[in-house]
């Protein structure tokens, strides 16, 4: 394999932005045979590499996987925790999981002598970090060619975004996160970083630290900023239609929202939780 040393060691690479917290690499004594892949992002790359984990996290509805992946045993992993005893029962020799679980479960994995490769995921990760993570995973578990292939796929997306931006007029935009008036997202959030590649000026960047990501907001600020278009996302709404029902009920109950051009003109884009 591309990431394997002559001694039989297996070298897993971290993306640059995680080097400070995790180091540049995770070195295993040998190629792992029983991987518990508790990250959908990592699972997409492992599936492309033809690697079959012994257990996986619940599959994201928005991600596409080969048929065989849907036959694998699953364990629920999320912000509320995970069933670590069930994971131990599969006797993994490597666990891949989001770094947000490290504080709670890292020591238990260490005590059990199970190496852990942490991935970065959630609303605070940017497009660029997502790209770096995918390439690092491909370097670690695939081949140099596969890493180059994935890098080229991201480059193609960026080229399409640049062409779209060059041919469309810019619009004043806000991202409403969770529910109307609860949170806003700057250009450093996951969705915000992708929309920053398109012809949108994120008004939240002008009233809060752009590096803040997803931060609290109030209705008065949104009304004052008066975006031409609003992108709505929520971790609790599986589909855009679910989210539309929540938002439109709130918009109808609070006439003040009609002062915003985007609301008044029906220019609100409701996205599924895959964009969170």
Can you name each region flagged by the protein language model?
Residues 36-90, 94, 203:
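A short, structured surface patch at a secondary-structure boundary
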Residues 60-65, 184-213:
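Alpha-helical, coiled-coil/dimerization segments enriched in small aliphatic residues
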Residues 74, 84-97, 114, 219-232:
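Proline-aspartate-enriched helix->loop->beta-strand connector
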Residues 128-142, 148-149, 162, 232-276:
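Structured C-terminal subdomain patch of bacterial secreted/periplasmic proteins
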Residues 194, 212-239:
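Ligand-binding pocket segment of bilobal, Venus flytrap-like solute-binding proteins
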Residues 1-41, 144-175, 234:
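Bacterial Sec-exported substrate-binding components of ABC uptake systems
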């Amino acid at each position: 394999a591309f990431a394997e040393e002559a001694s039989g060691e297996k070298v897993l690479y971290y993306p640059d932005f995680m080097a400070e917290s995790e180091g540049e690499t995770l070195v295993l004594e040998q190629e792992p045979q029983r991987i518990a892949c508790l990250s959908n992002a990592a699972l997409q790359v492992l599936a492309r590499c033809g690697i079959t984990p012994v257990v996986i996290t619940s599959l994201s509805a928005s991600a596409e996987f080969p048929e065989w992946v849907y036959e694998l045993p699953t364990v629920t992993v999320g912000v509320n925790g995970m069933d670590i005893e069930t994971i131990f029962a599969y006797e993994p020799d490597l666990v891949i999981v989001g770094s947000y679980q490290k504080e709670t479960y890292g020591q238990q994995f260490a005590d059990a002598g199970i190496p852990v490769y942490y991935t970065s995921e959630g609303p605070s990760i940017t497009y660029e970090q997502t790209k770096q993570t995918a390439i690092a995973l491909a370097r670690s578990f695939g081949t140099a060619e596969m890493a180059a292939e994935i890098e080229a796929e991201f480059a193609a997306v960026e080229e399409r975004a640049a062409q779209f931006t060059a041919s469309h007029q810019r619009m004043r935009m806000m991202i409403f996160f969770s529910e109307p008036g609860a949170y806003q997202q700057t250009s450093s959030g996951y969705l915000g970083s992708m929309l920053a590649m398109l012809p949108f000026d994120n008004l939240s960047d002008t009233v809060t630290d752009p590096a803040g990501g997803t931060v609290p907001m109030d209705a008065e600020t949104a009304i004052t900023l008066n975006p031409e278009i609003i992108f709505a996302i929520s971790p609790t709404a599986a589909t855009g239609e679910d989210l539309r029902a929540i938002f439109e009920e709130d918009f109808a109950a609070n006439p003040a929202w009609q002062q915003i051009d985007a609301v008044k003109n029906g220019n609100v884009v409701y996205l599924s939780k895959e964009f969170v």
